[in-house]
Amino acid sequence: MKEPVFTGAATAVVTPFRNGEIDFPAFEHILAQQLEAGIRAIVVCGTTGEASTLTPEERALLISHAVAYCAGRCKIIAGVGTNNTAQSVRYAKQAAEAGADALLAVTPYYNKASQEGLAVHYFTIANATSRSEERR
């Protein structure tokens, strides 16, 4: 039987700011606390991490920083959810290139999508990276 990709607890972390900029020392402190507590996965750039207010550059930096800092000691789940499928695909590709272990997408908000539209949204994001085959 194939081993599960994730086990144990995961934490969705906040994105600390100081003077309008990401506070990377504080971010590392948050990551260190989670690792010391035995957390098995960390969600970066989810709603708790202020994903909707981050620039694309900030999002890419946070995910890359988390992957590098955690260095395989836990899984990194990268938030790629937006109201725009094409933008979520771009974020998914960036996250995969940075080494994120999984993606977190959201249902498009403010638009009432059909069930077929929702399926297309999620499948498009899921199939956007070369790692898509790993989940099958």
Task: Identify the residue ranges that each predicted region occupies.
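N-terminal small/glycine-rich loop or linker at the start of catalytic domains
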Residues: 1-20, 47-49, 62-77
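Active-site mouth loops of central-metabolism enzymes
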Residues: 9-26, 54, 76-86, 110-115
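Conserved, mostly hydrophobic/aromatic
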Residues: 21, 34, 66, 95, ...
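Glycine-rich, proline-tolerant flexible connector loops at the mouths of alpha/beta enzymes
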Residues: 39-65, 80-85, 105-118
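Catalytic cores of alpha/beta
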Residues: 84-95
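Conserved small/polar residues in nucleotide/adenosyl-binding loops
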Residues: 134-135
